Amino acid sequence: GLATCMLILLYVRDELSYDRYNTNADRICRVNNEIRFGDNYFDLAVTPALQGSAMVREMPQVQQYARLRWHGSIFVRKGNENIREGRVGYADSSLFDVFTLPMIEGDPRTALKEYHSLVVTETIAKKYFNSTDVVGKTMLVNDTGNYKITGVIKDIPKQSHFNFDFFVPMMENEGANDDNWLSENWNTYVLLRKNTDVKQVEAQLNPLMNRHIGPQLQSIVNKSLDDFEKSGGYIRASLTPLTAIHLHSNKTAELDANGNIQFVYIFSAIALLILLIACVNFMNLSTARSSNRSKEVGVRKVLGSLRKNLVQQFLTELFLVSVFALVVAIVSAWLLLPSFNQLSGKDIHPATLFQPKMIISLLALMFIVGLLAGSYPAFFLSSFQPVDVLKGKLAGGFKRSWLRNSLVVVQFVISIVLIFGTIVIYRQLSYIHSKDLGFNRSQVLTINHTDMLGDRAITFRNELLQISGVRNATMSCFTPVNFARNNNTYFTSTALNPATGIGMQSWTVDENYIPALGMKILQGRNFSTQFASDSTGIIINEAAAKFLASKDLLNKKLYTPRDLHSKDIDEYHIIGVIKNFNFSSLRDVVTPLALFFGKSNGNISVQINSANIPDVIARIKDKWKTIAPSQAFDYSFMDDDFNKLYTTEQRTGQIFITFAVLAILIASLGLFGLITYAAEQRVKEVGIRKVLGASLRNIAGMLSKDFLKLVLIASFIAFPVAW
C-alpha cells in the first residue's frame, strides 16, 4: 500500500510541477481568445500575430512578450542519411527574456535574430555533432538549405507544456507580422511586471482588442463592432497563468496535449483509499489476533503496568512496523519506478525519492500511517482486564467486533466503487478504439512531406495506384488525424452579414479523398476532373448543412473575403454533403467543415488492400526512391496517428485501472487474512463438524457466511455511490 501511494505521489508531484522551472513562472501568462461568430464558438489558445506587441506598447504592466508556433517536421542531414525531427517551433528572439531556457553556447540576445538560423537543444547538438560547441556550424535542412546554429540551450525540462528541440526565428514565418486581427494562429505569452494584478491586466485586454478589431471588422463585413456584438457575436481575450496551463487548459490550438486536474484529484483519492484499505487490513488483523497477546497484557497489568504504559508500548511497536514498511515500500517503489514510467509516459528519476521535500513527505506519511493504523489496536489491546483474561472471556471471533466488521464493510465499499470505476474506464478506452469515426483509418498509410515533390506529387500518386495491393491513393493538405487545422469564415450572401457567418474547417483535397477514406456522401456527388466548375465547388459535412438549414443545399452559394486588404469576394457553390466524421477529440462535437477541390500535396494517403503490408510498403518506397532519391521516405499508419491523439487518455486510463486493481487486491488479501485467522480459531469446531459428517461445502459456508454478509452490506452501500 505504501509503495503504491509513493508512486501516485510521484505522479501527482510531477503533474503539479509543470512550468515551475521558469524563474518568473508567477509573472508569465498566455493570452487566449474566445470568439462567438453567428452560431460558431471558438475557445482558442492562440491570438493574432500582433497582439503581444500591442500589449507591450499599450499596457505598461506588460514588460515583454514572446510567441511560439509549431513549424512542422523537418529532415536534417547526418552523413548520407536524412533524419526526421518533429519537435520544431517558430520563436521570437524575446523567448529567452520570458522563459528560463539556459543557453550553453551562443548569445540569447541575438540567437534568434538571423534568417536561416537555428537554436537547438543540448541533446540535438550532441546527436549531430557529438559536442555542444557548435555555434556557427550549419545543418542541411530538407535538402534545400543550410541553417546556421546560433545557440545551444539545455534540454527543456519534461515538465513543460511545450518541448521543442529546434527553434526557428519567427521572422522566417511569412505571417509573423500579419496585421489581420481576425486571424488567430500564434501562441502568445506575456511577462508581467512585478506585483502586477493579472485581473487588472485582463480588464484592459478587451478594450485593446476592440481598438484594433473594430476598424478591420468594418472593412471586411461592413459592420461596426457594436452591430457585431448586438447580433450576438464577440471576440474576447483572457490570460492563463503559465503554471495553470498544463492542468487547467484544454483549448483549441494548445501547443501540446495537456493534463487534467481532475485526474490529479482522482489519483490522489485512489492513493488515500489504498492507504485507508492497507490501514484497515493492519487494524483488523492486529485486533483479530489480540487474543494471542491477552495473557501478556494481563500479566503486565498484574505487575503494575498502567494502561498508558501499554498504549505507549504497542504504539512504539506499531511505529517500528511502519518504519520497516516504509523502508520496504521505498525499495519496492525504486524497483517499480521504471515500469511505472513506461506505463505513465513519465520520466521520473529514482533520485526523486530522496529529495528533501520528498523525504519530509514520506516521513509525514509514515507518521500518519503509524498513528492511523496503530491507535485502535494499541487502545484495544491495552483495554484487556486481567480478570477477563484469566476467565478466558476474550474471543478472537468477528461477531462481537462491530468496529472490525464496519472496517471490513468500508474496505469493500471502496473496492466495489473502484471496480465500477475500472469498468467505466475500460469501456471508455474500448469506445475510443471501436467508435465509428465516419472514415476508414484501417490499413491507410500516410506518406508525409510529399509537398517536397512539387509537381511530381501527382505523378507519384498515379504510380502508386498501379501497385498491386494499393486500392486507392489521395493527395490532401490535411487528414482527419492531423493536429494542424485551417479555419475560415463563409457567408450566405455577398453582404457578409456576421449573423449569417459560418466558421468552417477548409481542407483542399483531390477526387480520391472521399472514397479512399471511406467517407459517405449523403447528398450530391464527389469531386471530378470532368467538371471544370468543381474548381469553385465545395463539399460540406452534416454540421455545416445543419447550420445552413436549407432544404436545397446543392448549388447553394457561399462567400468569403479574399483577404483583409481587398474588397474582392470569392464565391463557392455546394456540390455535395458528406456524413460527419471526427477530426478532433471525441470529447468535442463535430464542427462545420468544407472540402475544396485542388492540388494540395502536403501528404498522400494510401489505402492498402493486401495481407502482405510490408511488401506493399517496400514497393511504395521503391517508387519514392525513383522519383525523389535524395529525400527521406517518411510514413505512418493512420490508425497509429489516431491513437497518438488519445495517448494521454489511454495512459491515464491504464494508470487508473492498474491502481484500482491493486487496491482491490490489497482489500482481498486483508479479507483472506481475516478468513484464514477465523478458520484457525475454529479448528476444533471444524474437526467436530467433520466427524459428524459435515461436507467441505458446509464448512466453507460456515466460515465465510459472516464475511459474505459484510460484502452484501457493502454492495448495498456501494452500488448507489458508484451509480
Regions found by a protein language model. Give the residues of each.
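Hydrophobic alpha-helical transmembrane segments of multi-pass inner-membrane transport and secretion
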Residues: G1-Y11, G259-K295, S322-V323, V327, ...
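Membrane-helix entry/capping segments
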Residues: N22, R211-A271, S291-S294, W334-A364, ...
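Alpha-helical transmembrane segments of integral membrane proteins
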Residues: T252-D256, S286-V323, V327, V331-G454
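Generic structural signal for small/hydrophobic residues in well-ordered secondary structure
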Residues: I8, E15, V31, M55, ...
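Membrane-proximal juxtamembrane linkers immediately C-terminal to transmembrane helices
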Residues: R13-R36, P60, P102, G145, ...
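Hydrophobic, regular-secondary-structure patches
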Residues: E15, N24, C29-R84, S94, ...
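Transmembrane alpha-helical interface segments in multi-pass membrane proteins
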Residues: V299-L337, A663, K684-W723
